[in-house]
Amino acid sequence: MPTMGALHAGHGTVIRAASAMGPVLVSVFVNPLQFGPDEDLARYPRSLESDLVVAERWGAAALWAPSVEQIYPQGGERHPSTIQVPPGLQKHLCGAARPGHFDGVVTVVARLLDLVRPRQLWLGEKDWQQLVILRWLVAHLARPVIVQGVATVREADGLALSSRNQYLSPDQRRMAAALPEALHAARGDGSDPIPALRGSLSDAGFEVEYVQRVDPCTLQPCGDETAISLLAAAVRCGSTRLIDHAFLMTRQPLVAIDGPAGAGKSTVTRAFAERLGLVYLDTGAMYRSVTWLVLERGVNPSDGVAIEPLLKDLDVQLQSLPGGVQQVLVNGEDVSSAIRSPDVTASVSAVAAHRCVRQALTVQQKSMGSKGGLVAEGRDIGTAVFPHADLKVFLTATVTERARRRALDLEQRGFAVPERAELEAQIAERDRLDSTREEAPLMQADDAIELVTDGMDIDAVIEALVRLFRERVAEEAWPTPQR
């Protein structure tokens, strides 16, 4: 956990969260490369003895306070191997007002990663731009490090904890509470929040450096077309620079998980939804339900004309039972087990290919997801059902791996298990049918992230999905439910 010291309860909260995953090393280093010529490098709070007490109290295993010479053997004033952050990530927000600041941040963190070689890098969400940039750094350097963010910690009046808060006089401290108050008020009526927020901050006596609304992932300016956006401000309270932000949400988070048959989408999506407090929309179960009804009524799965009348009074209900069990009802009948039979599996691709079926179920699915707050899995969720989802993942695995999983699933459900070669052939044929059908073929959305799950157990896949989600949706915007 990299810090510049002057540790407080905000740092402590990050330490405590990280300590649940293993021993935590807290580094304390006031990095000269991230300070501008007229900034507060010389007077930045330094309190190593106090930092030791705070770090130990919150659960750190060790604290490391290296010298400038240890971090920058070739000199810290102008380090020869300074890393350049992409312009797009530092063109706005703090990067615009502090040229070179984030180049200095990534340079020191890269050095710390080289020297410490941690498994995880824990950071606060308070400086969201820095968190996004450090995620870029880890990917850019291809380091095997997991980046974890922790929600902003605030005082009782809403002021975000910061080491620089100690610069504030008592009067300035009272005034500083107007910053989070104004940000919170700006989230209200749905109009452009920037003019009103800028006015409120000026009226409160702040010198406003910037007020901007950006996409939390790209850090580019945005408006209401972005369902989840970051409204950020930097002000001067006396001589002290304060930053803060709020997340604006026109709807709750929406996640689309697509992939071929047998990739394990249902299992991991259900657990992922429960982990993050999202509703699980099992679209695959909906198509299987229609397929079951088609077979039950003796209709040819390839005959779309004969299937269409069955859809007029169709009532598919998905209900979550205790223990994460899903109950599927078709016109009031419990078909939870029946829709997983080999006969349904063999016919679902043909039934799902009919335009009338996809249109009927897509309308239902879009209605369910209109307010967000859910994760849906299927074949065309990110391309046809929820093309504006906040996170799109294409979850897949090799045919061999999917055949192995299918055999295990059939065995556990008490069905006969075909030879592995036959299962592989069935899965390959299902892939061909799904990807070549005329109506909503299986395909990876252009902005979806491919996640190949060979060699990953369920927990590892869920953790990967959670990390992808948190890169787009902050803990502060959508808190993880307490278990």
Curated annotation (Swiss-Prot):
InterPro entries hit by this protein: Cytidylate_kin, Cytidylate_kinase_dom, P-loop_NTPase, Pantoate_ligase, Pantoate_ligase/cytidylate_kin, Pantoate_ligase_C, Rossmann-like_a/b/a_fold
Subcellular location: Cytoplasm
GO cellular component: cytosol
UniProt KW keywords: ATP-binding, Cytoplasm, Kinase, Ligase, Multifunctional enzyme, Nucleotide-binding, Pantothenate biosynthesis, Transferase
Key word Nucleotide-binding present: yes
EC number, as in UniProt: 6.3.2.1, 2.7.4.25
Protein residues bound to ATP: 4-11, 124-127, 153, 161-164
Catalytic activity: (R)-pantoate + beta-alanine + ATP = (R)-pantothenate + AMP + diphosphate + H(+); CMP + ATP = CDP + ADP; dCMP + ATP = dCDP + ADP
Domain of life: Bacteria
GO aspect biological process, one term: nucleobase-containing small molecule interconversion
GO molecular function: ATP binding; CMP kinase activity; dCMP kinase activity; pantoate-beta-alanine ligase activity
Protein name: Bifunctional pantoate ligase/cytidylate kinase
Native organism: Synechococcus sp. (strain CC9902)
